Amino acid sequence: MGCGCSSHPEDDWMENIDVCENCHYPIVPLDGKGTLLIRNGSEVRDPLVTYEGSNPPASPLQDNLVIALHSYEPSHDGDLGFEKGEQLRILEQSGEWWKAQSLTTGQEGFIPFNFVAKANSLEPEPWFFKNLSRKDAERQLLAPGNTHGSFLIRESESTAGSFSLSVRDFDQNQGEVVKHYKIRNLDNGGFYISPRITFPGLHELVRHYTNASDGLCTRLSRPCQTQKPQKPWWEDEWEVPRETLKLVERLGAGQFGEVWMGYYNGHTKVAVKSLKQGSMSPDAFLAEANLMKQLQHQRLVRLYAVVTQEPIYIITEYMENGSLVDFLKTPSGIKLTINKLLDMAAQIAEGMAFIEERNYIHRDLRAANILVSDTLSCKIADFGLARLIEDNEYTAREGAKFPIKWTAPEAINYGTFTIKSDVWSFGILLTEIVTHGRIPYPGMTNPEVIQNLERGYRMVRPDNCPEELYQLMRLCWKERPEDRPTFDYLRSVLEDFFTATEGQYQPQP
């Protein structure tokens, strides 16, 4: 006997409890074929699902077969084009470009790894998301393009070999929310959410709950919609000729120079940062850029290539909504709820935790250096560039360009930049987020900020800022750097804060 509840502390699952009306014991599933034995020994099968015979085990020779999730048009010497649904055999699997052979044409070449999925597995299913966290499942389902009933199945974070169902729902009090169900495994290979009905495979489970909600918060409507992935950068293209870039639209100007939207080789949309001549040594920049390109994380803007002759160009991935400080002031940014604002802060903390783990330093962390995608994903830009600037207006604390209001006291006074001075800056960035881009220390000049900080002053709590969030800011502004929290701690607190404000899920009926 036993119930279907999850007791794992990390997961807020919908409870999967069904109790027999006669004996009042929890109902226990007995097999994985969609059947359930009851007292008179009769068999119950789900009338909403078409059951299929079990598939024979795949041949080891099929392990290197993949299916194209998207069509791909070749654009380099040596890459291989293919159509959506085409099968290919992987010949070499290394980096982000895999050598493959098309089973349709017999041709060989390199293919982008993120355009294909392993054949004879769950990966080609539009509703299956491999290696997706609970938090990222919520972000994806709440992104534009998804609606009530949009869903996905992902691998469980807490239990290896298990799965979770995440569904977008509407709550009268909270609005659009995502609810999670633990998909439980049977000993003989079947699955169930509610022990009233079991399934031989996830396909049958999805078909059943697409036909009827049957105790879930809503009927499953369609798989979570995602954008076609951007193909990886061609690995040999690092120092590129200036003529390979076409600058199309000037997006803005910052401390280091201008930023443009453009195209590389006429087909790849990129952002191009053009650095002011004399702003930094080309040799020092190239050395730093070689370090920066090793820092690859979903919360960091990807560095693709460089032009090392002055004016120096930095070519990165393009982020449709521009800088966070500007986006927060747009009509779309102003409408963001506190939950979404906190989620953006959690994303930034996640990226900075990666920088922290790699023993790197940003040195110029603020909302102007955070970029926002069209799905409201936040990524950190310009990490490491600040220390290369050779402009006295930027490097001296009296300089007009020095970001005094974001800089920790020890960095202002002694030039001591560490990951803990980045933590101070993150606390200031939090004020930018909750005020939708307001300049910190409103009404104060830079000299006044320095004088007040030396007297122990700290920025007051902004309007509409939760007290718990303000206390987190104050932790970031501790006088002694070693007393400030880690970015990993900040990430966990912000993610927990975001989850806690969603409220508790109701038990499944």
Curated annotation (Swiss-Prot):
Notes concerning its domains: The SH2 domain mediates interaction with SQSTM1. Interaction is regulated by Ser-59 phosphorylation.
Keywords per UniProt? ATP-binding, Cell membrane, Chromosomal rearrangement, Cytoplasm, Disease variant, Host-virus interaction, Isopeptide bond, Kinase, Lipoprotein, Membrane, Myristate, Nucleotide-binding, Palmitate, Phosphoprotein, Proto-oncogene, SH2 domain, SH3 domain, Transferase, Tyrosine-protein kinase, Ubl conjugation
Output the PANTHER family linked to this UniProt entry: TYROSINE-PROTEIN KINASE
Record's subcellular location: Cell membrane; Cytoplasm, Cytosol
What's the name of the protein? Tyrosine-protein kinase Lck
What is the enzyme's class at the highest EC level? transferase
Q: Which family does it belong to?
A: Belongs to the protein kinase superfamily. Tyr protein kinase family. SRC subfamily.
User: How is it modified post-translationally?
Assistant: Autophosphorylated on Tyr-394, increasing enzymatic activity, this site is dephosphorylated by PTN22. Phosphorylated on Tyr-505 by CSK, decreasing activity. Dephosphorylated by PTPRC/CD45. Dephosphorylation at Tyr-394 by PTPN2 negatively regulates T-cell receptor signaling. Dephosphorylation at Tyr-394 by DUSP22 negatively regulates T-cell receptor signaling. Myristoylation is required prior to palmitoylation.
Residues annotated as binding ATP are: 251-259, 273
Q: What is its EC number?
A: 2.7.10.2
Tissues in which the UniProt entry reports expression: Expressed specifically in lymphoid cells.
GO function terms (MF aspect): ATP binding; ATPase binding; CD4 receptor binding; CD8 receptor binding; identical protein binding; non-membrane spanning protein tyrosine kinase activity; phosphatidylinositol 3-kinase binding; phospholipase activator activity
